[in-house]
Each structure stands twice: as structure tokens, then as C-alpha cells.
């Protein structure tokens, strides 16, 4: 589902990758990270499948770049299941629970990560709400808009405010342009154009 915002996660990874290549001081002090994704998409959910394709393509680009081989990696676990989760949860250092506030049902996966020692960063959504109440704000890292704030900002989709953010944030702009400049999948600048268009011009997160 788009509301889980793994698209945002991928853009963040691209921004980190770009900065490692462009900023020697940042690269020298960068703490190595492996980003692990596990997901499925309904057969007819084209945009969700395209996001999975993007995750894998970004992973191929980064994992095969010798300049960052000891700094950043991207892994996608196919057919994510309980059996895979049993191995992943106990090994994770950070649990990213970043769904759009007001969209996620209250599951237990994030609780399992926390109980096994992973630090949780995320939005005030789903079971994060109950976890915050139980562990306190010093033990969970909450960021982003609350559900009512998200609802109030939907009207800005595709407006000049989106374009202003795009224009003023060079790191974000670079990552977005990589979706359509052929750098992720050499020779193809159209594969992820739908994601680029919907983020900038208005219907990201709505049914495709």
C-alpha cells in the first residue's frame, strides 16, 4: 500500500547514496547501513508493484556500485512471511514504522521488533500510538504529521506548495529526478515516470 510510504524510504536511500558520492566528509563519517524491505502487493495494484520494482532497481544500482560497497546496501526479501519475519525481527537494529498517520490498522509486527531490542522510528499511527503510551516518548522516536494534520494537507496535492518544496530542496529534487533520468535503470527513463508524476502532480496515495 502506498500509505506505508516505502516510496519515501527509497527516496531517502537515494539521497543518502547521492550524498556519500558527493560529500567526502559525509562519506568518511557515514555509519554503514543495510536497508531491508519485505513486502507483497496485490496482483492488480500496479503502483505498489512499481514501487517494489523501484526498490529492487535502486538496490541493484547501489549494491553494484564499488564506491559505496562498504557503506550502504539495499535488500528486498521476496514473499515476506512469518518464517522470514522470525529471522529478521531478532536481527534488526532499527524498525521503521513510517505509514501515513491515520491509515494503518493496529498490528503487532512493530511490537515484536521493539521487544527484540530494535529502536522504533515512525509516525503516530497504528500500534505506534499504543506503544508510545506504554514505553514513553524517550523510548520511541515519533516524527511527522498527525492524522488530522495529514487530512488538512491533502488539498495541497499537485499545487504550487509541492512545486516549492521540490524547487527548494536540492537533495529531494536530485532523488526525484533520478526516477526519470535513466540513472537507476540504464537506458530507461520511463519505467518510474508514473511515480514521479504522481508525487509532483497530484494523485499519489489514491487508487490507480
Residue ranges and their predicted role:
Residues 1-85:
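Long, K/E/R/D-enriched contiguous segments that form extended
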Residues 29-33, 69-71, 84, 89-93, ...:
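Short, well-ordered loop/turn elements at secondary-structure boundaries
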Residues 36-39, 93, 146-147:
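C-terminal, helix-dominated tail/subdomain
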Residues 70-74, 94, 103-105:
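Extended, charge-rich low-complexity interaction segments
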Residues 90-91, 98-208:
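Catalytic binding pocket for nucleotide-activated donors in carbohydrate/polymer assembly enzymes
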Amino acid at each position: 500500500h502506498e500509505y506505508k510510504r516505502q516510496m519515501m524510504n527509497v527516496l531517502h536511500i537515494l539521497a543518502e547514496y547521492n550524498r556519500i558520492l558527493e560529500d567526502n566528509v559525509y562519506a568518511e563519517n557515514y555509519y554503514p547501513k543495510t536497508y531491508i524491505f519485505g513486502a507483497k502487493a496485490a496482483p492488480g495494484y500496479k503502483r505498489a508493484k512499481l514501487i517494489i520494482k523501484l526498490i529492487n532497481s535502486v538496490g541493484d544500482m547501489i549494491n553494484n556500485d564499488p564506491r559505496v560497497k562498504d557503506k550502504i546496501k539495499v535488500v528486498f526479501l521476496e514473499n515476506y512471511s512469518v518464517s522470514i519475519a522470525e529471522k529478521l525481527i531478532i536481527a534488526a537494529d532499527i524498525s521503521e514504522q513510517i505509514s501515513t498517520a491515520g491509515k494503518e490498522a493496529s498490528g503487532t509486527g512493530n511490537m515484536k521488533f521493539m521487544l527484540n531490542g530494535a529502536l522504533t522510528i515512525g509516525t503516530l499511527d497504528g500500534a505506534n500510538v499504543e506503544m508510545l503510551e506504554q514505553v514513553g516518548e524517550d523510548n520511541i522516536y515519533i516524527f511527522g504529521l498527525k492524522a488530522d494534520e495529514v487530512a488538512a494537507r491533502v488539498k495541497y496535492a499537485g499545487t504550487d506548495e509541492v512545486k516549492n518544496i521540490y524547487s527548494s530542496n536540492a537533495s529531494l529534487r536530485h532523488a526525484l529526478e533520478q526516477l526519470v533520468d535513466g540513472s537507476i535503470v540504464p537506458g530507461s527513463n520511463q519505467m518510474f515516470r508514473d511515480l514521479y508524476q504522481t508525487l509532483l502532480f497530484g494523485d499519489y496515495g489514491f487508487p490507480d
